[in-house]
């Protein structure tokens, strides 16, 4: 999936090139769809009042918009995602709901979607943090590991716009962080999903070396080097394995001079 455009909320009916649009819907929401044209807003409000739209967290309602009914509306489909109670929404629940929306859109016949970002954010929360969580959840929602399947269900190449009243560099940063984080998590999931006879210490070491660049330095210690350092507890875990263990040391050095140092120690156990 790719981000191609960020739109201003005022231009929702004109500037978006997407063929569908997505709104969030809270239980106690009063002002529902005021940012779309009057006729479409009236229809959606009636559907909501009649109980045809679900605001339950994670529920998806799909509305088709024939021109004879939705006059002057530029989208062929409307996706409404339930967000539950306004004061209960947090990063994790929004991420989960966005994942549901992603899976629903993947199985539909639309190729692009415009997120009305303001409708997914409650006023009490940090707008940019929730925006990042929403995009992360949407991008991760379509993940599947089908490397070894004979019939692969390829991920749809879906383009999307983000419509927001807060168009600035902070929103750009939040969206870019979400894209980077989701891609990193997908790679981690791929590692975990590999079968044990494939993901050996050597393969995990190769993956780490491939990640290294000018800012990320990778050093791999083999059995003899670990033995020399007296790492007997570490070596004892792998003494029954056919393959010798590897200790992977990754060092991140940012371009800016930062005196703070943060250490993350992770454990990766492979089985043969």
Language model segments and positions:
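Short amphipathic alpha-helical segment within the helicase RecA-like ATPase core
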Residues: 1-268
């Amino acid at each position: 999936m790719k981000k191609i455009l960020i739109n201003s909320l005022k231009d929702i009916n004109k500037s978006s090139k997407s063929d569908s649009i997505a709104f969030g819907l809270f239980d106690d929401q009063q002002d529902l769809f005021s940012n779309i044209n009057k006729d479409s807003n009236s229809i959606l409000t009636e559907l909501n009042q009649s109980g045809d739209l679900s605001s339950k967290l994670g529920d998806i309602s799909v509305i088709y918009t024939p021109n004879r009914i939705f006059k002057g509306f530029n989208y062929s489909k409307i996706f409404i995602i339930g967000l539950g109670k306004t004061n209960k929404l947090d990063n994790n629940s929004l991420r989960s709901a966005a994942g549901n929306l992603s899976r629903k859109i993947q199985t539909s016949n639309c190729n692009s979607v415009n997120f009305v970002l303001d409708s997914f954010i409650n006023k009490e929360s940090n707008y940019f943090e929730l925006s990042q969580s929403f995009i992360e959840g949407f991008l991760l929602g379509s993940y599947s590991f089908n490397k070894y399947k004979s019939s692969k269900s390829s991920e749809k190449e879906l383009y999307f716009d983000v419509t927001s009243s807060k168009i600035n560099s902070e929103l750009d940063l939040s969206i870019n962080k979400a894209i980077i984080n989701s891609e990193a998590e997908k790679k981690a999931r791929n590692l975990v999903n590999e079968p044990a006879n494939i993901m050996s210490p050597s393969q995990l070491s190769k993956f780490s070396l491939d990640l290294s660049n000018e800012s990320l330095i990778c050093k791999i210690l083999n059995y003899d080097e670990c033995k020399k350092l007296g790492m007997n507890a570490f070596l004892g875990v792998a003494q029954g394995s056919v393959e010798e263990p590897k200790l992977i040391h990754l060092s991140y050095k940012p371009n800016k001079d930062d005196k703070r140092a943060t250490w993350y120690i992770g454990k990766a156990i492979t089985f043969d």
